[in-house]
Amino acid sequence: MRWPPWSSESTNDEQKQTPSSWLSSAANKPSSILDWTAFTELRTIIPTVVLTSGILIAVRFHRRYLRRIPDAPSISSSYLRRRSIFGQVTSVGDGDNFRIFHTPGGRMAGWGWLPWKKVPTVKKDLKDKTIHIRLAGVDAPELAHFGRPEQPFARDAHTWLTSYLSNRRVRALVHRQDQYSRVVASVFVRRAFDFPPFRRRDVSYEMLKRGLATVYEAKIGSEFGGDKMEKKYRKAEWWAKKRARGLWKDYRRVGSGWESPREYKNRMGMGDPLPIEKGNGKGNGKGKIGQK
């Protein structure tokens, strides 16, 4: 029986045959299913290239600028004398060395305000997660270590460095690594209450000006970050010495028994540490670096 009544019998037959006809047509034309021409069209190629390039650039950018470095031995040779490390000071161990927690990208990358990018404050949470830094170009008086007596003005240098850097964000231009799992670096800090405020300060230079350290002297050489910086440091030391500031107070007094941090180390048998060469970074013409 035809339905609807006014339809012709031929139309009804066509409707009955439509599903089977469609299947047979699909079977007879497999090329329509595996048609690759769509993948060669510009409207497909251009978005694919843009998306792939964007992913690769993002991965490279993250690896180069946003990947956190946990400790000094993990620093790649590509950083030495070429790049700097930004981080927050977590502790000050001596008058010329301290530890920072690497915060790549700083606040712009979310450090300090995103919940998952907080600098740990508990000591156990910082274990194996900080970079040990030795200030370049200076030698501060030694605190009491391993049964050795404390050198005069060692406590003053340590107290000043702690108050100047503790919990502050600093930028360290990495020069070399040493055998104590540290990096020798020129360190810079900006402070709101300095004059002028937020001016970039060279920490080594500030210590020399105040007579809290001497220019680093060693038989195998020292690291200053270039000849220009060495001249600047030596001039700052000369002025502090002339004005008898800090550890230079008794320098000219006869019978005071004054000795420099280097002379103290030599007397205590604390030889120069061996440097660890990493990569092919060129030095400053002063020999290998081994600051202690």
From Swiss-Prot:
- Provide the membrane topology annotation: Single-pass membrane protein
Residue spans of biased composition, Polar residues class: 17-27
**Main enzyme class:** hydrolase
- The highest taxon in the source lineage is Eukaryota
The active site consists of 134, 142, 182
Segment forming the signal sequence = none
Q: InterPro entries per the record?
A: SNase_OB-fold_sf (IPR035437), Staphylococal_nuclease_OB-fold (IPR016071)
Q: Where do the segments described as Disordered lie?
A: 1-27, 257-292
Where is Ca(2+) annotated to bind? 139
What cellular-component terms does GO give this entry? membrane; mitochondrion
Boundaries of every TNase-like domain copy: 83-250
- Give a GO molecular function annotation for the protein: metal ion binding
Q: Where is the composition biased (Gly residues)?
A: 281-292
| Keyword line | Calcium, Endonuclease, Hydrolase, Membrane, Metal-binding, Mitochondrion, Nuclease, Transmembrane, Transmembrane helix
Its Enzyme Commission number(s) read 3.1.-.-
UniProt lists the family membership as follows: Belongs to the LCL3 family.
Give the protein's recorded name.
Answer: Probable endonuclease lcl3
Q: Which species does the entry assign this protein to?
A: Penicillium rubens (strain ATCC 28089 / DSM 1075 / NRRL 1951 / Wisconsin 54-1255)
Quote the gene name from the UniProt entry. lcl3
